[in-house]
UniProtKB/Swiss-Prot annotation:
Keywords: Ligase, Mitochondrion, Nucleotide-binding, Transit peptide, Tricarboxylic acid cycle. The gene is Scsalpha1. InterPro entries: Cit_synth/succinyl-CoA_lig_AS (IPR017440), Citrt_syn/SCS-alpha_CS (IPR033847), CoA-bd (IPR003781), CoA_lig_alpha (IPR005810), NAD(P)-bd_dom_sf (IPR036291), SUCC_ACL_C (IPR005811), Succinyl-CoA_synth-like (IPR016102). PANTHER family: SUCCINATE--COA LIGASE [ADP_GDP-FORMING] SUBUNIT ALPHA, MITOCHONDRIAL (PTHR11117:SF2), SUCCINYL-COA LIGASE SUBUNIT ALPHA (PTHR11117). It comes from the Eukaryota. Succinyl-CoA synthetase functions in the citric acid cycle (TCA), coupling the hydrolysis of succinyl-CoA to the synthesis of either ATP or GTP and thus represents the only step of substrate-level phosphorylation in the TCA. The alpha subunit of the enzyme binds the substrates coenzyme A and phosphate, while succinate binding and specificity for either ATP or GTP is provided by different beta subunits. Pathway: Carbohydrate metabolism; tricarboxylic acid cycle; succinate from succinyl-CoA (ligase route): step 1/1. It is found in: Mitochondrion. Residues 1-21 form a transit peptide. This is Succinate--CoA ligase [ADP/GDP-forming] subunit alpha, mitochondrial.
Length: 328
């Protein structure tokens, strides 16, 4: 099991390098931006999860305009039209985003269908998508410049008080000035709650997921946050496994330095994790001498990031730094 995971991680690291150099897919980073007018459709709309979270999204105020269920096209669900395919839904509703609540065996096919329909933002919530399926998705992603994938195995993405796409609790979010990006769903909620409590609020929160093969990484989100004039500070939540945090540190060193640098606070989960053992997420494993928490912490601190050892202090540390910089 450990050997097969190490092999997958090597493939993943190769893909990360490929995507980093791929200007085609990088052009879709702007698709992460959401607002109150963002139109959303749902794949797996009439299933148990799709129904529950679509109802939650509607109650939050998200502009959900329809859903997809291949065998129920032409009907209505939650007062919205049901379509037989993503292509049909796109033609009728012109969505900016689709959210996927399809079971693991069919999730990759659902992503590919949305990709072929050129939906700008694809958010896959599904956990347990086979990694060999995601390799195929990754191949398709990096060869195009129309669609951006968030996930799989993630809580989703939310522009507080405007558009909620995913399973996150809406009530803890507040419109404000902090960008949050995280590999961990529950720690995302912790950061959100803390920044709400100290009065900072959030501009955009992205749960990128903890699988080895995902569609959006830290750097994709950091670029959006650094370019957004409304985002005054950033929280980055990482964990053991891979080198995404180290690459994020390199990016911040290059693009977030000097007098106009935005304050960044980070927490890295898994400090006490033993090498070779997966800790929760499929990608959370220290392998081949890489992926340890201490290496990530050192890289981020070298880039000027404030790394807190306690997840309970993320909001407090960011507020303190923003106050020092007279940003609040």
């Amino acid at each position: 099991m450990a050997a097969s995971m190490r092999a997958l991680l090597k493939v993943r690291d190769g893909f990360v390098a490929g995507v980093r150099c791929n200007s085609q897919y990088n052009k879709t980073r702007g698709n992460l931006k959401l607002n109150g007018d963002s139109r959303v459709i749902c794949q797996g709309f009439t299933g148990k999860q799709g129904t529950f979270h679509s109802q939650q999204a509607l109650e939050y105020g998200t502009k959900l305009v329809g859903g997809i269920s291949p065998k129920k096209g032409g009907t209505q669900h939650l007062g919205l039209p049901v379509f037989a395919s993503v292509a049909e839904a796109k033609k009728a509703t012109d969505p900016h985003a689709t959210v996927i609540y399809v079971p693991p065996p069919g999730a990759a096919a659902a992503i590919i269908e949305a990709l072929e329909a050129e939906i700008p933002l694809i958010v896959c919530i599904t956990e347990g998508v086979p990694q060999h399926d995601m390799v195929k998705v990754k191949h398709a992603l990096i060869s195009q410049s129309k669609s951006r994938l968030v996930g799989p195995n993630c809580p989703g993405i939310i522009a507080p008080e405007q558009c909620k796409i995913g399973i996150m609790p809406g009530h803890i979010h507040k419109r404000g000035k902090i960008g949050v990006v995280s590999r961990s769903g529950t720690l995302t909620y912790e950061a959100v709650h803390q920044t709400t409590e100290v009065g900072l609020g959030q501009t955009l929160c992205v749960g990128i997921g903890g699988d080895p093969f995902n569609g959006t990484d830290f750097i994709d989100c950091l670029e959006v946050f650094l370019k957004d004039p409304e985002t005054k500070g950033i929280i980055l939540i990482g964990e053991i496994g891979g080198v995404a945090e180290e690459k994020a540190a390199d990016y911040l060193t290059e693009y977030n330095s000097g007098i106009k640098a935005k304050p960044v606070v980070s927490f890295i989960a898994g400090v006490s994790a033993p090498p070779g053992r997966r800790m929760g997420h499929a990608g959370a494993i220290i392998s081949g001498g890489k992926g340890g928490a201490n290496d990530k912490i050192a890289a981020l601190e070298k880039a000027g990031v404030i790394v807190t050892r306690s997840p309970a202090k993320m909001g407090h540390e960011l507020f303190k730094e923003m106050k020092r910089l007279e940003l609040v």
